[in-house]
Amino acid sequence: MDEQKMPRRPRRDHDGEQPQKSESLVYGKNPVTELLKSGSGVDTVLLAEGMAPAVAAYFTAMAKEAGATVKRVHPNKLRLMTGTESHQGVAAFASEIEYASVEDLLAAAKAKGEPPFLVLSDGIEDPHNLGAVMRSALLCGAHGIVIPKRGGASVTPTVIKSSAGAAEHLPVARVANIGETIRRLKEQGVFVYCADMDGVPLRKNNLTGPIALVLGSEGSGVSQLVKKLCDGVVRLDMAAQGTGVDSFNVSVAAGIILYEIQSQRAGE
């Protein structure tokens, strides 16, 4: 089942001068591996300097898949943070937020007497981009954002900071499968659009009813599977041609599309 989020302010600076043991700090190879696999949310993975390259590569790859930041630290710092010499060169900070369910997001829209307006991340990896998307989503009236448990950024302190305060007010649901979530939303009458370069020009779409906007990853965009599940595809036309600059940054594209949705929903 999906989880609910009501964000809390970050508790600590992971680079602080006086690191201390914390209940949210998990250490040891097996515990950290299981935490990363669980999809329960990881802010940062700390790897000891001097760790075997193959082991470091393993945890770096897992951290990227889980949307976590990787930092290399001196073994003594890990000892201070964990309170033990048996940290095995790896530790991780669990996410500091509580997630909501997709049903909670829909209920929030109903409570306001508004048709649902959701944003879905299909693999946005950069925490700064995710934070910027959250900021635009809040300002444009979205009732929440949905992110994947794996294969994209989770809501870390970097995301919270990049959202410029939006993360304190915008509910976030984290789901195991974006495709299945789209199917469930469609069953409940939500019209699902994705943003892609081969879509219909943005302003030619009716964006006034129950709606969800899917945004793809920075590198490959919306996956083909997700795209096939969507009811419609929108695109942003660009004036510059033949320059080699052929797309908007995902957070910029999100801001433009979300503002158009807000305008149409307001009857403008």
Where are these regions (language model features)?
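Structured adenosyl-cofactor binding patch, chiefly the S-adenosyl-L-methionine
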Residues: 33, 160-166, 228-268
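Short, acidic/turn-prone active-site loops that include or flank metal/cofactor-
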Residues: 50-51, 76, 150-152, 218-220, ...
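RNA substrate-binding interface of SAM-dependent RNA methyltransferases
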Residues: 37-41, 107-200, 204
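Surface-exposed amphipathic alpha-helices with a cationic face
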Residues: 64, 182-186, 262
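Short, glycine/polar-rich helix-capping loops at beta-to-alpha or helix-loop-helix junctions
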Residues: 55, 152-158, 220-229
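N-terminal positively charged helical leader segments and presequences
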Residues: 1-108
